[in-house]
Amino acid sequence: MSKKYFGTDGIRGRVGEYPITPDFMLKLGWAAGKAFRRQGICRVLVGKDTRISGYMFESVLEAGLSAAGADVLLLGPMPTPAIAYLTRTFHAEAGIVISASHNPHYDNGIKFFSGQGTKLPDELELVIEELLDNPMTVVDSAQLGKVSRINDAAGRYIEFCKSSVPTGTSFAGLKMVVDCAHGATYKVAPNVFRELGAEVAVLAAQPNGLNINDRCGSTDIVALQAEVLMQRADLGVAFDGDGDRVLMVDHTGAVVDGDELLFLIARDMHEHGKLQGGVVGTLMSNLGLELALQDMGIPFVRAKVGDRYVMAELLARNWQLGGEGSGHIVCCHHSTTGDGIIAALQVLRALKHRGQRLAEARQGMRKFPQVLVNVRYAGDKDPVGHPVVQEACERVTEQMAGRGRVLLRKSGTEPLVRVMVEGDDESQVRLHADNLAKIVSDVCA
C-alpha cells in the first residue's frame, strides 16, 4: 500500500500549500497521537528548527496531540538528531521534528522518530495516514494530554555530543570556523567544539526565522570558504538547517563532502580496530569511496538514497557506519540517525590520530568526477521508466565501458528526476549528464 503524504523523510512542502497548512498539521498531530496512544498513556517530544513557521506548526501539533490524549514535551529549536536522542532518554513514545532541513524558510515539514530514536516504520506511517481520513475527535477533558517545556535540552545534548569522543579528548590548538546555517545548531554546535578546546569562529548563528539556509550552511558553502581563508583557520564545518548534515572545508578552502568524511571516519575506525563490519553508502555515493574502502579490505554496500535507508541497511547487517555525499553520516555506535555534530567530532578525532591537516588526510581517497543534474517534472509521469530514457542510459553505460556509471532516480521530497553520471573523464561525464538531462526533460514536456 503506497503512502499519500509521507515521503522518504517525512512530510515536506511549501508553507500554506496543502498539506503544509495549520489545519492539516492539527489533524496530523491528532492522528499521530491516536496512533501512539494505542499502547496506553504516551509522551511525545516536539522540537523544531528556526524557521518562522515552526512556531505556528508547533502550536497546532501540540493541540492535536493533546486532543488525542498524548502528553507533549516542547524542546524549542534543537537539531533533528538531538530530538532523536532526547526521545530515547526521556523514554517518550515518539519524537516529532518540525523542519524542512536544508530547504529555504518558506518550506517546512514534519518527521517522526520512534521511542528508540529511529525513523518510524512504514507500517506506522500508514496507520497515521489511515487515521487522517477519520473525523477528528477529542478525548474527555480528564484525559487531555498535558503540555510542558524542557528548558535544559541544549545542555543535555551538548554533553551527549561530547561523550562521542573519549574522556580527555582535547582539540586545543585547532582553529576552526563553524557555520550554523542560521539553523537549529546555533545554540549547541559552537559550544560543543569550544568545550573540547578548539578555537571557534562562528558564522550564520543569528536566526531571525527567515534566514535559515540563506547563503550559508552546507548547501551554500561559499561564505565558509572565504571565512576559513580570512581567519587562516585549520578547517571549517558547515551544518544544514536542522543539523543532520555536515560538510567541511580544509585550510585551502577546498570543500570536503560527505563521502570523503565517511572515508576519513571509516579509515580511522578500521586502523584502530573499532569498525564493526563494513560501511553503507547509497546509490549516489562516489565510486572513489567504494574503491578506497575496497583497498583497505572494508566491505561496502549501497542503500537507496535517504538516511532512513542507510540506517535500515546498517541495522540489518549489524554494522556501525554509513552515510551520503550530502553529509548525512550515521554513526550507529553513537546515534540512531544522521548527526552532523557527532560526525564532525569523529573526523576531528581521526585527524588528531593521524597528526594531519584535513587537506592531507583526504588524499587517501580519489574522487571520481560526478555530475548531478536535476530535471523538474509535473503530474504523475514516470520519466525514469520511459523506454526512450532507459535506452539512452544503456547507451551511455556502454560508451563508458566499465569506467563509470549512470543513475537516474526520482526525488522522494520534490518533483525532480536526479540524473547522475560518474566516470574518470570529467568532460565526458558532463556531456553525458547534460545529454541525458535533455532527454528526460523532453520526455517530461
Curated annotation (Swiss-Prot):
Annotated Mg(2+) binding sites: S101, D240, D242, D244
Entry's Gene Ontology BP terms: carbohydrate metabolic process; peptidoglycan biosynthetic process; UDP-N-acetylglucosamine biosynthetic process
PROSITE patterns, A to Z: PGM_PMM (PS00710)
Top EC category: isomerase
The species this protein was found in: Azotobacter vinelandii (strain DJ / ATCC BAA-1303)
Protein name (database record): Phosphoglucosamine mutase
Source taxon at top rank: Bacteria
Residues where Phosphoserine is found: S101
Active site per UniProt: S101 (phosphoserine intermediate)
GO cellular component: cytosol
Documented EC number(s): 5.4.2.10
Entry keyword set: Isomerase, Magnesium, Metal-binding, Phosphoprotein
GO MF annotation: an example: magnesium ion binding
Chain segments annotated as transmembrane: none
Family under the similarity heading: Belongs to the phosphohexose mutase family.
Catalyzed reactions per annotation: alpha-D-glucosamine 1-phosphate = D-glucosamine 6-phosphate
Function: Catalyzes the conversion of glucosamine-6-phosphate to glucosamine-1-phosphate.
Record text on cofactor binding: Binds 1 Mg(2+) ion per subunit.
PTM summary: Activated by phosphorylation.
CC cofactor: Mg(2+)
